[in-house]
A protein has these predicted regions:
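Short beta-strand and beta-hairpin "edge-sheet" elements
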Residues: 79-80
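Short coil-to-beta-strand transition motifs
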Residues: 68-76
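Buried, small/hydrophobic-residue-enriched core segments of structured protein domains
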Residues: 69, 83-448
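N-terminal, Lys/Arg-enriched amphipathic/low-complexity engagement segments
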Residues: 1-47, 62, 212
Length: 448
């Protein structure tokens, strides 16, 4: 019987433009790009040059500090450009795709015949090891770590997030194979929604399955780790996106690196919200072309709370499960501002009268609606943070640079995304996710 854990802290933000369960196909796409910044914590070293021909699965760059960690091209084709920014930082590696795709053959494997070292070696060789993250530090993991557990959250609850039950349809065999492969390395814990009707997810082999019920961010893998396997200093837990599990399963079953994923195209400024199959590194222009309303819009590579601001010139992120388009809001003109009833506006603390109209989908824009101010100790964070940590005190310790206090308050167990809802409700308008990222990076440097 599946264990059920119910959380009560959090906030569900209902936004207009949720993707309907309709999947469309992209037209012909010729240009792709892999972005090193998608793999937090690595130092990229490019191993190809312009004009080189690569197969799908060949490395485009490696982690300079761990050269055995490769990052594979999503397509076969000609390396078109290595785009660099300030101080020669690698921004992306562009590949012009062949008309007919060729894959590097790593050979299909019987997962039952592999041990943990065999799985590690295969993932390193094929360029999929970098898709595994770790706690502490919420970074792409390294081969010198030994996890005490591996966590996979097989559902999503961020605003406008896609339904993983729908995304995984037809790929259940690959998902199970990926879970079995990871179980060769450490105990695998899979979180699913209590509402999930997918029998494969509910009856997974080689994993401990836990059903979760509660408001956002109950789906965050950091919440699962905090409840089931707290991370102490010196310990490591791996976290794997459910789509990366499918990538691993495909590699074992076919011998190919196939980075195709089903993403939600959502938001109030999307004409027809839907799902689409796209490779990692697909141009956002190809995904959104002809499906965005006119006017000033914010294109987000990811969900509205944790995604990054992007443009039509951007590329689908390595861990991105949705592309969102919402109003920018810079052309809004509201008479009398906050003093108006604002029946069409969302408020977490019922500052507006919209709550009288019952549950509904809101059309929110990208405005912060307020300036930065001193941190207010109001208990707001704790109301939406379903973890056994003192969120406000942890943020204060990060701002103060007090590493000892950060360790005592549980920084090893958190990722920036765990503070996404707290950032949304924060009266101080602080960029909490950026602060947590800064604190984790500082702590990592201190402990290296």
């Amino acid at each position: 019987m599946i264990n059920l854990i119910e959380t009560h802290k959090g906030l569900d933000i209902q936004l207009a433009g949720k993707a309907s369960e309709k999947k469309t196909k992209l037209g012909v796409v010729s240009d792709y790009a892999l972005v090193p910044d998608d793999f937090t914590g690595i130092v990229p070293k490019v191993v190809v040059k312009e004009g080189d021909h690569v197969l799908a699965g060949d490395p485009l760059f490696v982690n300079k500090n761990f050269p055995e960690v490769r990052f594979a091209s999503p397509v076969s084709g000609i390396v078109e450009a290595v785009v660099r920014g300030d101080r020669r930082k690698v921004l992306c590696v562009k590949v012009k795709a062949d008309d007919s795709q060729e894959y590097r053959d790593f050979g299909s494997k019987n997962v039952d015949s592999l041990d943990g070292n065999g799985v590690r070696s295969l993932l390193l060789e094929a360029g999929l090891f970098g898709y595994i993250n770790q706690l502490p530090y919420a970074v792409s993991t390294t081969p010198d770590t030994t996890p005490k557990a591996i966590f996979v959250s097989a559902f999503r609850d961020m605003p406008l997030a896609g339904d993983f039950d729908f995304e995984v349809k037809g790929q259940e065999v690959d998902f199970q194979t990926g879970i079995t492969a990871l179980s060769k390395i450490a105990q695998v814990n899979v979180g699913i929604s209590s509402k999930s009707q997918n029998e494969t997810l509910r009856n997974l082999k080689d994993a401990t399955v836990t059903a979760w019920q509660g408001p956002c961010p109950a789906a965050n893998v950091g919440v699962h780790v905090n409840h089931l396997c707290p991370v102490n200093k010196g310990e490591v837990v791996w976290t794997v996106d459910p789509v990366a599990v499918i990538f691993i399963g495909r590699l074992l079953n076919t011998g190919k690196v196939d980075l195709r994923r089903t993403i939600a195209v959502a938001g109030s400024e999307v004409v027809e919200p839907h799902y689409v199959d796209a490779l990692v590194g697909t141009p956002l222009k190809a995904i959104l072309e002809g499906n965005v309303r006119e006017g000033a819009v914010r294109i987000i590579n990811g969900n509205p709370l944790t995604g990054r601001k992007d443009s039509l010139d951007g590329y689908l992120g390595a861990h991105t499960s949705e592309v969102t388009v919402i109003p920018e809001g810079d052309d809004a003109d509201e008479m009398l501002g906050w003093i108006m009833p604002r029946l069409g506006h969302f408020s977490a603390n019922r500052s507006y009268f919209s709550w009288l109209l019952g549950k509904r989908d809101y059309k929110l824009d990208a405005r912060v609606k307020g300036g930065k101010r001193n941190m207010i100790m109001s208990g707001e964070y704790d109301k939406v943070l379903p973890m056994d940590i003192y969120g406000e005190y942890l943020i204060k310790a990060i701002i103060a640079g007090d590493i000892d206090k950060q360790e005592q308050l549980g920084i090893y167990e958190v990722a920036p995304e765990d503070f996404a809802v707290a950032e949304f409700v924060d009266s101080s308008k602080l960029e909490l996710q950026s602060l947590v990222r800064k604190g984790l990076d500082t702590l990592r440097k201190e402990n290296m």
